[in-house]
Amino acid sequence: MLLLIFGKDSRLKYFLGALIAVAVILFIINIVDLNRYVVRSVAIYDSKIKKRLKVCFVSDLHNYACTPKFYEDIREYAPDVILCGGDTLTATKGRKQDRAYAFLKELSKIAPVYSALGNHEYRAMIYPEVYGSLYDEFLSKVKEYGINLLSDDSVYFEENNIKVTGINIDRYFYKRFKVFKMEDGYIESLAGKLEEDKYNVLLAHNPDYFEYYNAYGSDLILSGHVHGGLIRLPLLQG
């Protein structure tokens, strides 16, 4: 129950009213953002890149039914490879994942697909007693559609001198409202020793640990998880 008690001071009343109005507006904006996508094009130049590679990065579809325009936009971009940041599934016991698999199938028709795991796939993998055969089913579809899974694994595009690595940080690091300390060498234990002569791309689902990914030395870090980005609040560190 929410109980608001107003006294004679109308300033408090106006302040609380304004606060509620701002909260409602932010909530509406959040709902809208969660149900749309924005296409951003970024050009990266680096002396280690031998030849241009057009990459499309998508993440956190969560068993969503994509519109034809979504796929048209990707086809129009004509990527050489497609990178997935994870959470193609929504790990809910007994829930059908048909739309997630349709998404992977359509992507595989456009370009070679390389996918990391998100926390939902990772959860399905480590808790089969909860999610049953969900992860095995996911692996079966990945194999059927020729998706390349980067689960603490890498792929090297020799012609471009670009190495892409996907890592799975422990479930412990996905606890809400808390960022934990990672031990020295933890990212290297997942990704392997950094090859500094290559252009290194790291697929790391949770962006909260950017400082650790960056310390590892990757040239480019691609994350998902936060569904619309992070907002830094001044003075509050949140």
Residue ranges of model-derived segments:
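Extended recognition/assembly regions associated with phosphoester-bond processing machinery
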Residues: F27, N35-D46, E188-Y212, Y216-G217
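Conserved beta-sheet core of the metallophosphoesterase superfamily
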Residues: E144, V201, N206-G238
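Binuclear metal-dependent hydrolase catalytic cores centered on His/Asp/Glu-rich metal-binding motifs
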Residues: M125-G146, S154, E158-N200, F210-E211
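Structural motif
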Residues: L53, D80-V81, I162-K163, Y199-V201, ...
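Catalytic metal-binding/acid-base residues of hydrolase active sites
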Residues: H62, T88-L89, H120-E121, S154-V155, ...
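Short loop/edge segments at beta-strand edges and connector loops
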Residues: L150-D153, A204
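Membrane-embedded segments
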Residues: K51-N148
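N-terminal membrane-anchoring alpha-helices
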Residues: M1-I49
